[in-house]
Amino acid sequence: MEAGALATLSERILENADFPYIKVESSLQAVKDIAEFYLQQLQIPVVGITGSVGKTSTKEVIASVLKEKYRTLKTQGNFNNELGLPLTVFRLRDEDEIAVLEMGISDFGEMTRLAKIARPNTCVITNIGTCHLENLGDRDGVLKAKTEIFKYLQKDGHIVLSLIHI
């Protein structure tokens, strides 16, 4: 509250709380839902970037080019998971014109949840390698998990694929 928050989220009833709070079933799910709603209200284009390797470098290059013409917000560092993506979305302001969002996963279903928040206009897949095989099985599993991003690609959106295999 000292940082200026109007309320906090809690998964339990806070007896004798001297600050406003919202009781939720899951704090993480609530944060993701709020981020999804907030980004939809801003109605700015989103570039969603995923892949086995090269996500951060690709994000940096794309954001560098876009910032020459547009006020661009990009994922800081590799805040690319189910908590990091919403935290990035919360940094967006009305004056931002485009968001470049990195999305990293290690299991099936994660990309669907990230893409639901981002709803990208452009999807970039850097490559499909052999990362996270412990949960995804093989390269085909990685491909299946990464391409979950397409479930929430905006109508008339664009897809950029790398033809380089690792």
Q: Where are the regions that the model predicts?
A:
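N-terminal leader/targeting and accessory segments in enzymes
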Residues: 1-33
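Short beta-strand/turn micro-motifs composed of small residues
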Residues: 10, 76, 161
